[in-house]
């Protein structure tokens, strides 16, 4: 530790404070006597004064951004997050008895991932890999990245002699393109699940008039489909088409497919045609780690994932690769990530990934994953009881894909209605849609609500809210007199209309319900305080935290 910094420590007043984001901030003051004692030069003191902004809290430095974050925190706390690709950040409860009494409490009491992601590690540049960096001063970063890689392999029970992993990708999309770059050449052929059938943009999506993503711009793409009627992947047709198309790469993975994958069958198709098999398990990686979904690792050559969905880490990506597949596979993957597709890694994010992976290996995480699936199945059951059409007639994972076309509604209209009443869903294409811009369904994901300690009984309430939202949408569409989206919005925005009155009541009911449940990462909630009281954790909450969840004007 530098002598100057060491001399300052006794004179720095450190006051941990919890802001709306529960981030620790420091209030720094320098004793003038230190300067008189010669421990601080006049230039050093002047520099500290000039850099005062570096020690301000967010609220002090930028009230405008702080207000936006405050409003967003209220939105999440007072609403129901049903976006399938969103999941609250993970938390681990220290007392073992809490895990025993309530297995989902690991989501509520620690800010470990957020703290790692907002740490000093963001300051360090570290292009390259551990032991082979292009910058100095990376001894601690090397330890961190090696730890993260070890935890990634352990989380999925992988043998380090067989599997390797790159933890540097900035996102799942970057991970996918880097994996493509490592495995195949430009204009080689790929096959992935079509976007309207539940696939992902990065798996080669294009339209009749335009190649939409880099994966279709730089590679030749021929999507496979689900079977009309059942919504299940048509493995028979995939077998036939792959035999004709001879892809160099087959991608198995989805963003809106509510069933599990037959990796063994896909392996056979890939081997028959000399194809690599890549699994993009971004949506289900947490469920795979918990043993609640089939594992792609037994059959696939490369496995990619995001880290922020059911794995519940920060926003980033991972690439797993079989080292025994080809002798240069590890080198190809690592070089595809850097320098081919990105620059220096985000070390703060890697730290957050490491924390999340440790938590994913905890037995409590398995209970969380089981509950996610149970909650999704409860939503599906209740919606089906109202005779709504669900893709594949149910779910085996964390999401439900709801087909609204039989009702004469679009996903866009339900998304608009739900936004107004603090329910967040996303419009989504369903099998048979002719345009991704006007999708006929919505995707409902249950990872985030499970992280808020909701179980099957609460899912019945949530499903009832969704049912009411659809009925209000039908009323608004009738009031609009046509099916134009702008007139639909105008109808439920008119306070004299029945749809507006029903919507206002639904909004109140949703807020009243949602604010009974803690929001992971934000301990300053009445629900969070009540949980602490219930379990008699001896913490002086009144002095440790100041409740700062505020209801913004207009809500």
Regions found by a protein language model. Name each.
Residues 99-104, 130, 162-163, 343-347, ...:
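Flexible, glycine/charged-enriched surface loops at secondary-structure junctions
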Residues 1-49:
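N-terminal mitochondrial targeting presequence
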Residues 74, 87, 122, 126, ...:
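Conserved internal helical-beta-strand scaffold that buttresses enzyme catalytic cores
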Residues 389-457, 527-534:
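Conserved PLP-binding catalytic core of the aspartate aminotransferase-like
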Residues 147-387, 408:
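Conserved PLP-enzyme active-site core in the AAT-like
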Residues 3, 8, 48-50, 57-63, ...:
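PLP-dependent enzyme catalytic core of the Aspartate aminotransferase-like
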Residues 72-79, 123-131, 247, 330-335, ...:
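Short acidic (Asp/Glu) and glycine-rich catalytic loops that position anionic groups and cofactors
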Residues 44-132, 461:
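N-terminal "arm"/small-domain region of PLP-dependent enzymes with the aminotransferase-like
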């Amino acid at each position: 530790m530098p002598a100057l910094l060491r001399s300052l420590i006794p004179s720095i007043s450190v006051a941990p404070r919890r802001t709306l984001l529960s981030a620790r901030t420091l209030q720094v003051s320098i004793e003038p006597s230190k300067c008189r004692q010669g421990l601080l030069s006049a230039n050093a003191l002047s520099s500290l004064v000039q850099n005062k902004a570096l020690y301000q809290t967010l609220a002090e430095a930028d009230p405008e951004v702080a207000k936006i974050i405050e409003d967003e925190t209220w939105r999440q706390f007072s609403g129901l997050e049903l976006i399938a690709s969103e999941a609250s950040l993970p938390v681990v409860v220290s007392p073992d008895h809490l895990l025993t009494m309530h297995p989902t409490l690991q989501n509520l009491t620690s800010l470990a991932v957020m703290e790692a992601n907002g740490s000093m590690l963001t300051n360090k540049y570290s292009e390259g890999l551990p032991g082979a960096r292009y910058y100095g001063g990376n001894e601690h970063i090397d330890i961190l990245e090696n730890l993260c890689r070890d935890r990634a392999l352990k989380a999925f029970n992988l043998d380090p002699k067989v599997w390797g992993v790159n933890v540097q990708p900035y996102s799942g999309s970057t991970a996918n393109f880097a994996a493509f770059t490592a495995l195949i050449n430009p204009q080689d052929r790929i096959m992935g699940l079509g976007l309207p059938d539940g696939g992902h943009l990065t798996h080669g999506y294009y339209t009749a008039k335009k190649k939409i993503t880099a994966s279709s711009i730089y590679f030749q793409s021929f999507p496979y489909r689900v079977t009309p009627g059942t919504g299940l992947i048509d493995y028979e047709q995939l077998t036939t088409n792959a035999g004709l198309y001879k892809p160099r790469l087959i991608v198995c993975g989805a963003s809106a497919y509510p069933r599990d994958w037959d990796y063994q069958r896909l392996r056979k198709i890939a081997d028959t045609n000399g194809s690599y098999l890549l699994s993009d398990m971004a949506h289900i990686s947490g469920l795979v780690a918990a043993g609640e979904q089939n594992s792609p690792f037994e059959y696939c050559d490369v496995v990619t994932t995001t880290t922020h969905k059911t794995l519940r880490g920060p926003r980033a990506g991972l690439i797993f690769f079989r080292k025994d597949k080809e002798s240069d596979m590890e080198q190809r993957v690592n070089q595809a990530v850097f320098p081919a597709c990105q620059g220096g890694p985000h070390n703060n994010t890697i730290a957050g990934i490491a924390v999340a992976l440790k938590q994913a290996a905890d037995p409590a995480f398995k209970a969380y994953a089981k509950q996610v699936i149970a909650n999704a199945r409860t939503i599906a059951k209740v919606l089906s009881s109202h005779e709504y059409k669900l893709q594949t007639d149910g779910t085996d994972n964390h999401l439900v894909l709801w087909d609204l076309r039989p009702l004469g509604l679009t996903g866009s209209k339900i998304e608009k209605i739900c936004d107004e009443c603090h329910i967040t869903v996303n419009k989504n294409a369903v099998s048979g849609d002719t345009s991704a811009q006007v999708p006929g369904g919505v995707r409902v994901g249950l990872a985030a609500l499970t992280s808020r300690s909701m179980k099957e009984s609460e899912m019945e309430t949530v499903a009832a809210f969704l049912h009411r939202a659809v009925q209000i949408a039908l009323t608004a569409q009738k009031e609009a007199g046509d099916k134009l989206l702008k007139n639909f919005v105008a109808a439920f925005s008119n306070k004299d209309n029945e749809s507006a009155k029903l919507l206002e009541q639904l909004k109140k009911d949703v807020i009243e319900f949602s604010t009974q449940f803690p929001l992971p990462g934000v301990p300053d909630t009445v629900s969070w305080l009540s949980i602490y009281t219930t379990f008699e954790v001896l913490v002086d909450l009144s002095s440790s935290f100041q409740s700062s969840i505020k209801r913004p004007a207009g809500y």
